[in-house]
A protein has these predicted regions:
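Conserved N-terminal phosphate-binding loop of PLP-dependent enzymes in the Aspartate aminotransferase
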Residues: 1-134
């Protein structure tokens, strides 16, 4: 099952669910829904968004560039033990910062984000301890 929203209609309020037919047919009509019910403008925006993703090869580009990013971040991980983990899919990649004892290195992650911003690279911390950068 794939649940999608936000970028589906390039910022307009729309969400969708995709799954195998046999799974979708188990739901009683009207038993599922949400606050992003499709209107004509949002649906047209979603069609245009999906068309642009396909025609411009955005998924392939995200895979290619994401692999390069992962490679670079893994090289940094090998050089700097404070990078405890590097993970992701496509261009949604994170680096998790950990202290030598394995605890979350929140202050370090925030300092890295601040240093990157000074170099005009906008990143953000995330995760339950704010020690992960994406």
């Amino acid at each position: 099952m794939l649940v999608m929203a936000k970028g589906l209609a390039s910022g307009l309020p729309l969400s969708g669910i995709a799954a195998r037919r046999e799974l979708m047919e188990r739901w009683v009509p009207g038993s599922h829904g949400g606050t992003y019910g499709g209107n004509a403008v949002a649906c047209a925006a979603a069609v245009a968004t999906i068309r642009a993703i396909r025609e411009e090869g955005l998924l392939e580009n995200a895979q290619r560039m994401g692999a390069r990013l992962m490679e670079s971040l893994q090289a940094l991980q090998n050089e700097f033990p404070v990078v405890g983990d590097v993970r992701g899919l496509g261009l949604m990649v994170v680096s998790e910062f950990t202290a030598p004892d394995g605890s979350p290195a929140t202050d370090l992650a925030k300092a890295v984000v601040k240093g990157c911003l000074k170099r005009h690279l906008m990143l953000l911390t995330c995760g339950p301890w704010d020690n992960t950068i994406r």
